[in-house]
Amino acid sequence: MSLTGLPDIRKKIGQFHHLRIYKQILSLQGNFARLNYFLGDVFPANLRSASVSVFFEVRLGPRIPDCIVLLKSVDAKDEFAFHCYFFEFKTTLGKSTMQSVHHNCIHQAQYLQGLRQLQQSISFLDQYLIADEVSWNVVPVICFFRQWGLKLDFFKKFSGKTKRLSFSFIRDLFARSQDGAVQSLLSIPNYTNFRRACQKHTDLYRKRCRKAPKSVLTKTSGENRSRASRQVAKNAPKNRIRRTAKKDAKRQ
């Protein structure tokens, strides 16, 4: 099954939850332990003191990975000067597992699409290889989040690839190739305003019901009152109706 066959509303909901994931990552950027936990503990412990840079929806040729986390190692024993993690996020209504990826056609399509995205995004960097530059460890990761509560259900971390790249050039490439609209949304500090802006960005409006014409409303209200009166009379006890009728007859 191809994801292009999904209803547009499902795609828009997925985009909305992607923005929520990005916002959460930004809020945890300064806390290595919490950020690592949120993403499945994919970062090794020796990077605890590394400086962290985060980029979202970076256009790399034909592909746009969801998130790139760049860590500058300060460990003298580390064979890599930089660790670059490419993340592809998938959101699901129900729980996702390795088994569901094999048997659920939608999860499987999401997984395969994510793999292609990661593979082609990382391969794009090959044109910038420089023989005498420092070594990078470039690692692809795919994460499945449940939409309710943004719970990480399942992730897969693949083997890293060693590349020799210029830090200043690649960092600037990532920074200037980010989606400008997404950056503007993520800069909104208030969460309520951020959520509303995300709904607008993804076209997920809470549409209000249109008001009916006054004539229709008046007629409907009158009909409802008449129906209510008939219902009360119908439900009234018969003996009470009879006593009331006798009293009226005596008065006459």
Curated annotation (Swiss-Prot):
Show the segment(s) annotated as Disordered: 215-252
* Entry keywords, A to Z: Host cytoplasm, Host Golgi apparatus, Host nucleus, Late protein, Virion
Q: Does the keyword Oxidoreductase apply?
A: no
Induction of its expression: Expressed late in the infection cycle.
Q: Where does the UniProt annotation locate this protein?
A: Virion; Host cytoplasm; Host nucleus, Host nucleolus; Host Golgi apparatus
Q: Name one GO cellular component term.
A: virion component
Comp. bias regions, Basic residues: 237-252
Pfam families for the chain = Herpes_UL24 (PF01646)
Q: Which InterPro entries match?
A: Herpes_UL24
Family the UniProt entry places it in: Belongs to the herpesviridae UL24 family.
The role this protein plays is: May participate in nuclear egress of viral particles. Plays a role in the dispersal of several host nucleolar proteins including NCL/nucleolin and NPM1. Since deletion of host NCL/nucleolin negatively impact on nuclear egress, UL24 supposedly acts on this process through its effect on host nucleoli.
What is this protein's name? Protein UL24 homolog
